[in-house]
A protein has these predicted regions:
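Terminal, low-structured helical/coil segments at or just beyond the last alpha-helical repeat
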Residues: 246-274
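TPR-adjacent "capping" and linker segments in tetratricopeptide-repeat scaffold/adaptor proteins
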Residues: 1-9, 42
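Amphipathic alpha-helices of TPR/Sel1-like and other helical repeat/solenoid scaffolds
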Residues: 14, 26-41, 75-78
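Conserved alpha-helical positions within TPR/SEL1-like repeat arrays
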Residues: 9, 13-19, 47-62, 87-102, ...
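Short coil/turn linkers that connect adjacent helices within long alpha-helical scaffolds
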Residues: 21, 40-44, 79-85, 121-125, ...
Length: 274
């Protein structure tokens, strides 16, 4: 007779085998089959069943089936709370928040992000801290709550700096995100300082030719464009486009946005000169 542990290993092995050969459109059926089998062989009060439901949610999410993923993550979260597993509850809250965020359910997503953040802080587990703070900042920015966005982005910078040091990609990402928020609130001096910081860190970490370096240059171009410093803006647009085009196609949305901004700047400079 197989033990529960052995059955679980067989289930997971079979799932992974199917995923490796399946197409994305087959993931929904794979997840359903896996979960149905898990419900048959595992006790309803088994923590492994909670794991199985979470894995099914992961499969749906990987296939872009966000509604189905949300259903699974909710179910798994409810069970993890019943078991009193703080790590699982924190992890599932974060997963559910991300899926709801992508589904446009910002209000509910914010609650689950904050729940996950609180649990990770209580456990003194900082592995997801900066990521969650950045996600909360982005969500609040999207809601137009710029005060909350600034608060979360500032905390993300502090956490990233404390965990990784001042010259780390995570610290640069947090500085970049806060800088973008300041562009939207037209606080261009703060935005300039943060994007310069992000650019300096990224050049140190990656060298001059890297997409994230190009992103920082493009953001600085927008700052100087908005401040009326057209010569600096032009230099950063040119640098950003040169770097981006080494890694992206011309029809890439980010490249097209930078190109459109650069074209608008050139038109403005022509008018100013005439």
């Amino acid at each position: 007779m197989q033990t529960t542990a052995n059955l679980w290993e067989v289930l997971c092995r079979d799932l992974e085998s199917e995923r490796q050969t399946a197409k994305a459109e087959q993931y929904q059926e794979i997840a359903r089959k896996f979960l149905d089998t898990a419900r048959q062989v595992l006790r309803p009060d088994s923590p492994r069943l909670c794991d199985a439901i979470e894995i099914a949610g992961d499969v749906h999410q990987a296939a872009g089936q966000l509604q189905e993923a949300a259903v699974n993550f909710r179910d798994a979260l409810e069970k993890s709370e019943q078991f009193g597993s703080a790590p699982a509850t924190a992890r599932l809250s974060a997963k559910l928040a991300l899926v709801l965020d992508r589904l446009g359910e910002a209000g509910e997503a914010r609650g689950f992000y904050e729940m996950a953040l609180s649990l990770y802080e209580a456990m003194r587990d900082h592995s997801q801290h900066a990521l969650l703070l950045n996600q909360l900042g982005a969500l609040c920015k999207g809601q137009g709550d710029m005060d909350a966005a600034e608060k979360y982005y500032l905390r993300a910078m502090e956490v990233a700096g404390a965990l990784h040091g001042s010259n780390h990609p995570e610290t640069a990402a947090a500085a970049n995100n806060l800088g973008v928020a300041y562009i939207e609130t037209r606080d261009f001096v703060k935005a300039e300082n943060l994007h310069m910081q992000a650019l300096s860190i990224r050049e140190l970490c990656y060298g001059a030719m890297h997409p994230e370096v190009a992103q920082s240059m493009a953001n600085l171009a927008v700052v100087y464009h908005s401040m009326g410093n057209y010569q600096k803006a032009r230099a950063f647009y040119v640098g950003a486009l040169k770097t981006f085009k080494c890694f992206r196609e011309a029809n890439d949305p980010e490249v097209q946005t930078v190109q459109a901004n650069y074209d608008a700047l050139l038109q403005l400079m022509e008018k100013s000169a005439s």
